[in-house]
Amino acid sequence: MTVTKTAAYETLTESSAAALAVRLGLFPSKSTLTCREIGDGNLNLVFRVYDKEQQRGLVIKQAVPYAKVVGESWPLTLDRARIESSALIRQAEHVPHLVPKVYYSDTELAVTVLEDLSHLEIARNGLIDGKDYPHLSEDIGEFLGKTHFYSSEYALDPTVKERLVKQFTNPDLCDITESLVFTDPFFDHETNDFEEELRDEAEVLWGNEALKIEAAKLKQRFLSAEETLIHGDLHTGSIFAGEDGETKIIDPEFAFFGPIGFDIGQFIANLLLNALSREENRRAPLYRHVETVWNTFSRTFSEAWENDAVETCKHENGRLESVLRQAFEDAAGFAGCEMIRRTIGLAHVADLDTIVPFSRRISQKKLALKIGAAFIEKRSGFRTPKDMIEAFRNALKE
């Protein structure tokens, strides 16, 4: 695709980001500000602007017209900034305590100005350091239960949902997910990235036609099931957390109307990838998170259904159970795709890539591929999170 920048668009620098904050009236004109680029993501520029005298800061996030992880050879739409700010505002209608405040957004500059969350840390980093965040999965379950229900056909008038589907149409970023999660890792594709010691396992996976058919079915669900407004990229790097129990979900630029089970599947996959990086005696908190996130999501979604479902749904016996059953099966399959993608595809996770020694890193990555394939192929047999955990632990013993 070709990205067209508007006449107003210019890439921010540390000095121009600070000037923008003053121009918007977010700091007094005579403030002495410091501004530092803090982004380490694949797609955007992120600046923290701070007034030491007032001890107050904010974050300015700007989309750039290409994928930073690849370079200008991979152009991307700037409209993802609008998607992100709109998603955060909608999520805040239901879980304001779990998302950052949006102070300002500008579609021409592709800028979103956000609450400063520097008192928290990225959950992935904390989990790698051995922190457990006991409230993390309960918060994510509540976030998903409420945001997924209240943006679904079970809560919305059909015309409202149709309008939202159009508002959050996000073809470029959906194409990234389709390629990097559901397609490329299952073939010998140039975007794949892995150690040569994993080639034998990768080639076995590429030759598994039954697995590839199941992955294609999951891709079809991802592309066609316009069930609710999903976050679209809910891994542990998209979550800020604090040991005092505070949680904030960030970066919903991949948001669009997709299957209910996708977000929870991605979150579970990243929990289990972290579990692979730990010794067995340190994995119990991750197993608890897997159970808690599903149980909290299911309970929250069910309570919202009982209170606020449209009348037609309330009179359909078994409909809620069917929706949750499909979401759980999908979540298991999507988790499997995510585990495989994060092991041999583009954009790895530090949970695996920082394992030492190298020999253990390779052995754990081989397990990630094996577990991912099992989750995809056996997803219809999973009934509870305990089934996922049992499959995970059994793979470790084999």
Swiss-Prot record:
InterPro entries: Aminoglycoside_PTrfase, Kinase-like_dom_sf, Methylthioribose_kinase
EC number: 2.7.1.100
Known pathway: Amino-acid biosynthesis; L-methionine biosynthesis via salvage pathway; S-methyl-5-thio-alpha-D-ribose 1-phosphate from S-methyl-5'-thioadenosine (hydrolase route): step 2/2
GO biological process: L-methionine salvage from methylthioadenosine
Residue numbers binding ATP: N44, K61, E115, D116, L117, D251, P252, E253
Main enzyme class: transferase
Pfam family, any one: APH
Molecular function GO terms recorded: ATP binding; S-methyl-5-thioribose kinase activity
Catalytic activity entry: 5-(methylsulfanyl)-D-ribose + ATP = 5-(methylsulfanyl)-alpha-D-ribose 1-phosphate + ADP + H(+)
Tree of life domain: Bacteria
Keyword Transferase: yes
Binding site for substrate: D233, R341
Keywords annotated in UniProt: Amino-acid biosynthesis, ATP-binding, Kinase, Methionine biosynthesis, Nucleotide-binding, Transferase
Subunit record text: Homodimer.
Family listed: Belongs to the methylthioribose kinase family.
Function according to Swiss-Prot or TrEMBL: Catalyzes the phosphorylation of methylthioribose into methylthioribose-1-phosphate.
Protein name: Methylthioribose kinase
Organism in which the protein naturally occurs: Bacillus licheniformis (strain ATCC 14580 / DSM 13 / JCM 2505 / CCUG 7422 / NBRC 12200 / NCIMB 9375 / NCTC 10341 / NRRL NRS-1264 / Gibson 46)
